[in-house]
């Protein structure tokens, strides 16, 4: 199990996870999964009612398949950055969906692909080692692109996976009903899926249906995270990722795609560097 592999609660607190920025040499921190929860999520979770389910669902797919946008839609908040560039996600990002009857921990992974670089190989290895540590896998395939070699490459990998696999046809709003039906048939022919669900994260269509399907594959379990926690990403990592998202979207030609951001220090917004309070509307970070 890698540092980013999910773990279930053990009851012992651990230090917060570190940022995973390969270009900067940082390694992913411990994350939640079948053995224990570390970092901010190590705090005691509330007691579960009878019949409660909790567990982990991993979103996989080729780069730019809509995994991060879908993660944000299910959580109902921005926990993963998105951009028009493939391979924006560089480490496993966890978002928590809270319901009265279940707690679903989503693991958004980097895109799986045939690697051409060392970074690409590392990202693939990270995804594959995560697959065996979750309760259900969701393969994301966009509706507006024909099923191709990359999808078949991943489908063959997932055929050997232990957890059940749900096929998710993303970006359903981008095609006609006729084209969506054709894509659903093509995806069905790719493998033996536990379920097939078309969704539109942008319009919020079928999001509740997908959540119900994923929850149905979770084991009975008490909550793994406190009720007010939607991610276990440290604050510094979240800030760094938001900066990287803005750079990838707004400075496309001037910056390399293999951009990494490391936050060295976060100043108290109510004080300046000398310790005196900042007056007016100015804030420093």
Residue ranges with predicted function:
Residues 2-24, 28-136, 141:
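Conserved G1/Walker A P-loop phosphate-binding module
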Residues 61-62, 108-111, 141, 169, ...:
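Flexible glycine-/small-residue-rich
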Residues 235-285:
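P-loop NTP-binding site
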Residues 58, 72, 91, 95, ...:
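Solvent-exposed alpha-helical segments within well-ordered globular domains of core cellular machineries
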Residues 98-103, 122-196, 268-270:
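Conserved C-terminal guanine-recognition region of P-loop GTPase G domains, centered on the G4
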Residues 163-164, 173-231:
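Canonical P-loop GTPase G-domain recognition
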Residues 86-88, 110-113, 143-147, 172-175, ...:
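Conserved nucleotide-binding/hydrolysis micro-motifs of P-loop NTPases
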């Amino acid at each position: 199990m890698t540092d980013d592999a999910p773990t279930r609660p053990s009851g012992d607190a651990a230090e917060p996870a570190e940022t995973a920025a390969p270009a900067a040499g940082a390694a992913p921190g411990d994350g939640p999964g079948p053995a224990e929860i570390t970092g901010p999520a190590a705090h005691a979770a509330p007691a579960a009612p009878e019949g409660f389910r909790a567990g982990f669902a991993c979103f996989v797919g080729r780069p730019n398949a809509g995994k991060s946008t879908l993660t944000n839609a299910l959580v109902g908040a921005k926990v993963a950055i998105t951009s028009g560039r493939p391979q924006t996600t560089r480490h496993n990002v966890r978002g928590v969906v809270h319901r009265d009857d279940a707690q679903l921990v989503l693991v958004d992974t980097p895109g799986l692909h045939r690697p051409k670089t060392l970074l690409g190989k590392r990202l693939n290895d990270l995804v594959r080692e995560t697959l065996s540590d979750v309760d259900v896998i969701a393969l994301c395939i966009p509706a507006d692109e024909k099923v191709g070699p990359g999808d078949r490459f991943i489908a063959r990998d997932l055929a050997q996976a232990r957890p059940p696999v749900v096929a998710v046809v993303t970006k359903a709003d981008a095609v006609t009903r006729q084209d969506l039906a054709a894509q659903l048939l093509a995806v069905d022919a790719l493998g033996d899926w536990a379920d097939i669900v078309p969704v539109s994260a942008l319009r919020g269509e079928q999001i509740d249906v997908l959540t119900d399907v994923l929850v149905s594959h979770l084991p009975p379990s008490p909550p793994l995270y406190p009720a007010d926690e939607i991610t276990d990403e440290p604050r510094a990592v979240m800030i760094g990722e938001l900066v990287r998202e803005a750079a990838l979207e707004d400075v496309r030609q001037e910056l390399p795609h293999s951009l990494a951001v490391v936050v060295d220090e976060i100043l108290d917004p109510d004080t300046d560097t000398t310790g005196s309070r900042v007056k007016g509307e100015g804030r420093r970070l």
